[in-house]
Amino acid sequence: MPGDLPYNHSMSNDFLSTDPYKGVRDFYPEDMAIQQYIFDTWSKTTESFGYERYDASVLEPASLYKSKGAVNEEIVNDQTYTFTDRGDREVTLRPEMTPTVARMIAKKQKELAFPVRWYSIPNLFRYERPQKGRLREHWQLNCDMFGSDTVAADVEIIALAHQLLL
């Protein structure tokens, strides 16, 4: 039929696969509508608590994760998508957002008015064995408050989490 592409559900030399990379998924329009509704709800709720949205590149220097120490050694050594780019730099697809937001806060700490309330809905990647309900690519809501170590700050985060569940 005119316009048909040489695709096949299975990999062979003559056809391209219609399956996504193992551990990730495609988002068709109906899936995107659901995801967008969830993200919009998260954003509206989080912003009602005074949090501002931020984001960053999915690529980070691999050293950012290696410097976190032995606590995350398994993630750094076994569960990251790390590669050497054309400039001979070791790069990682971010497996979590904490090192990235800490880097961003540190860079602008003299310009920021603390406490800082930021949130993100990052796309994250972990190279682990896909299993039911757990993929290599996922999104999550991160809500961070920097510059306050009070009980009130803890209560605020708990109240925010509670509101998100309603």
Task: Give residue spans per PLM region.
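TRNA-recognition modules of translation machinery and tRNA-sensing kinases, especially anticodon-binding
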Residues: 7-166
